């Protein structure tokens, strides 16, 4: 698959089937993240790969949090996506004290590389932010002291790729001066 094709075919997939995402494919996805550009070459990311019972544990932490704190119930649809995923990758910012915008932009580039690599491999993916409701619990559970949870990427095979969403025309999103 060519890059432009992967960009056009990338979708936020939230419904996954039971097929396993192989360790080999996960490593390709992480290698793509590793090669992302980063501000000042700081590479401020650490990835925690979760499978099987660990995914159920994250789901249960989300459910427990939502039961205790009504304001977090907006994450309920996300919790279902988490539970259906074959693989979760927690993306931590290893340098939260540095310029947040630089670190978050760098991490965003790494995540986009992951999503495009997953697309190229025929694996569904979705970039999740709502796991922030259990950031403290995740940091403690997976020993990520001093780090900040930036996002979670859910991966899995799918039976049906979601339809593309409408996009603004190029003329509506740019200004060109010469």
Language-model regions, residue ranges each:
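N-terminal amphipathic, basic helical "cap/leader" segment at the start of enzyme domains
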Residues: 1-85, 178
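Cyclophilin-type peptidyl-prolyl cis-trans isomerase
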Residues: 79, 90-91
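C-terminal helix-cap and adjacent tail motif
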Residues: 6-9, 148-178
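Short beta-strand segments
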Residues: 91-92, 154
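Solvent-exposed alpha-helices and their adjacent loops that cap or buttress functional pockets
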Residues: 39-42, 81-83, 141-145, 166-168
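Structural motif
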Residues: 86-88, 125, 148-150
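Small-aliphatic-rich amphipathic alpha-helix that forms the alpha element of a beta-alpha
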Residues: 33, 89, 95-140
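Short, hinge-like loop/turn segments at secondary-structure boundaries
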Residues: 64-66, 143-146
């Amino acid at each position: 698959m060519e890059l432009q094709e992967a960009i056009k075919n990338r979708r936020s997939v939230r419904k996954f089937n039971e097929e396993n995402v192989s360790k080999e494919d996960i490593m390709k996805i992480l290698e793509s993240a590793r090669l992302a550009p980063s501000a000042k070459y700081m590479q401020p990311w650490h990835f925690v790969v979760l499978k099987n019972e660990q995914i159920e544990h994250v789901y249960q932490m989300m459910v427990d949090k939502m039961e205790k704190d009504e304001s977090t119930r907006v994450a309920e649809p996300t919790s279902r996506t988490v539970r259906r995923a074959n693989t979760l990758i927690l993306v931590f910012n290893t340098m939260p004290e540095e310029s947040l915008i630089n670190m978050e932009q760098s991490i965003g580039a790494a995540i986009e590389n992951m999503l495009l690599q997953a697309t190229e491999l025929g694996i569904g993916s979705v970039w999740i932010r709502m796991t922030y409701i259990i950031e403290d619990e995740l940091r403690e559970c997976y020993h990520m002291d001093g780090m900040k949870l930036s996002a979670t990427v859910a991966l899995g095979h799918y039976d049906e790729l979601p339809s593309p969403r409408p996009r603004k025309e190029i003329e509506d999103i740019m200004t060109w001066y010469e």
